[in-house]
Amino acid sequence: MLSYWEKSEMLEHDLIVIGGGITGMFCALCYRELYPKARIAVLERGLFPSGASTKNAGFACFGSLTELMDDSFNMDQESMLNILELRVKGLALLRKTLGDKIMDYKAHGGYELFFEKQPKALDMISHFNALLQPLFKADVYRTSPSKIKAFGFDNRKVTHLIENAFEAQINTGKMIQGLRSKLNQKDIFFFSNTEVTQLDTDQKKVVTKSNGENLSFRFKKLALCNNAFVKQFFNDLEVDPW
């Protein structure tokens, strides 16, 4: 049974964010900047973020050459460049918010290996470098044959290596820990192991399950930041995360 203080101080919020990954925590931090006195809570169903925030390999990337080639087949050029720019700005915001040391950011570059004798990507380097020149003010992609052996690959199998000097690596565990620390500094609640089982936008409440107990949180505003899992609450939405 909850106490009066638990009900009044922990269950009623101006903003509730569903999803405790990168998107959810940044949403909460940005809202705090706009509304310094707001009561904000982040609800995460897992002990750790359930999405990709800590499950990727630590890539601080915006797109290899072949990824951009694939994107160009699936969308128009303007859309592709807009998405790429958002990725680049997102990485810049992450670095500005946490600092490189906190998340162990290392600018080692990004590398793509090829096994064909003459992959199509080689012919597209100059094309995409020209497209990205306004954003980076330099060539993004280049061939680096000397690094095939330097990295320990068999050059009889790996025929080409294309380097992206603007990509890097991060420690996603340290990154998430850093963001959690930011939430604490900004007086934002974070509830882990708290799965939202019911969402009622009319009554402005979410029902959660934590340690076998059902709890109702009330909100004035709600942000769904669980990306691919948003269909859990709105089945009719066509959500295709990139």
List PLM regions with ranges.
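Central helical "cap/lid" subdomain
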Residues: 210-242
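Glycine-rich active-site loop/strand segments that organize a redox cofactor
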Residues: 51-85
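Glycine-rich FAD pyrophosphate-binding loop
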Residues: 32-55
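Central beta-strand plus flanking loop segment that forms part of the substrate or channel wall
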Residues: 57-60, 65, 110-113, 237-242
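Helical element adjacent to the flavin cofactor pocket in flavoenzyme catalytic cores
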Residues: 155-219
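Extreme N-terminal leader/targeting segments of oxidoreductases
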Residues: 1-15, 33-34, 38-39
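Flavin (FAD/FMN) cofactor-binding and adjacent substrate-gating region
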Residues: 66-72, 96-181
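Glycine-rich Rossmann-fold phosphate-binding loop(s) that bind the pyrophosphate
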Residues: 19-25, 45
